[in-house]
Amino acid sequence: GKLQAFLAKMKEIAAQTL
């Protein structure tokens, strides 16, 4: 649910940061 979406968002942001 929301946790999956949150983790996906964090992962996406992390990918953009790196």
Swiss-Prot record:
The lineage's top-level taxon is Eukaryota
Cellular location(s): Secreted
For this UniProt record, the keywords arranged alphabetically read as follows: Amidation, Antibiotic, Antimicrobial, Fungicide, Secreted
GO BP of this protein? defense response to bacterium; defense response to fungus; killing of cells of another organism
Q: List every position bearing Leucine amide.
A: 18
Naming one, the record's GO cellular component terms include:
extracellular region
Found, by tissue, as follows: Expressed by the venom gland.
Function, please?
Answer: Inhibits growth of Gram-positive (S.aureus, B.subtilis) and Gram-negative (E.coli, P.aeruginosa) bacteria and fungi (C.albicans).
Q: Which family does it belong to?
A: Belongs to the cationic peptide 04 (cupiennin) family. 05 subfamily.
Q: What is this protein called?
A: M-lycotoxin-Ls3a
Organism the protein comes from:
Lycosa singoriensis
Q: What is the lineage of its organism?
A: Eukaryota, Metazoa, Ecdysozoa, Arthropoda, Chelicerata
